Regions:
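Basic amphipathic alpha-helical segments that dock to polyanions
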Residues: 49-56
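Amphipathic alpha-helical dimerization/coiled-coil segments
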Residues: 86-109
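Accessory beta->alpha helical hairpin/"wing" motif in late/C-terminal subdomains of nucleic-acid enzymes
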Residues: 80-84
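N-terminal helix-turn-helix DNA-binding core of bacterial DNA-binding proteins
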Residues: 4-48
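Short beta-strand/turn micro-motifs at beta-sheet edges
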Residues: 2-5, 66-67
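Short, contiguous hydrophobic alpha-helices characteristic of membrane insertion segments
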Residues: 4-6, 60, 109
Length: 109
């Protein structure tokens, strides 16, 4: 995958929810963590990240609170809600079904 490749459409919610499952994080840190964990294969652009964070907050899956980042800048920290924790399981199951389907097509064609 090209180093500047954006995240596959439809997977961003899953990646964000999984990334903040262990601890609240601010937007830039979420994008950096996804990039780091994926060995630089996935990059989340700000133009995709912040609308997704707002959508997830509107759906009640995450909350946002103002705090200080590691360099003492004011930032919004995003955390999973109880509903968000349930949604992680739903999103993982959807991804596993989709991935299995794609693998079948790749193997049988």
């Amino acid at each position: 995958m090209h180093p500047n490749a954006d995240v596959l459409q439809g997977t961003l919610d899953l990646l964000i929810l999984r990334t903040i499952a262990l601890e609240p994080m601010h937007g830039w840190a979420i994008a950096q963590r996804i990039q780091q964990i994926s060995d630089e294969l996935l990059r989340v652009q700000q133009g995709s990240l912040y609308p997704a964070l707002h959508r997830l907050e509107h759906q009640g899956w995450i909350t946002a609170e103002w705090g200080a980042s590691e360099n003492n800048r004011r930032a919004r920290f995003y955390a999973l809600t109880k509903a968000g924790r349930k949604q992680v399981d739903t999103e993982v199951a959807k991804w596993e079904r989709l991935s299995a389907g794609v693998n079948l097509v790749l193997q049988r064609t």
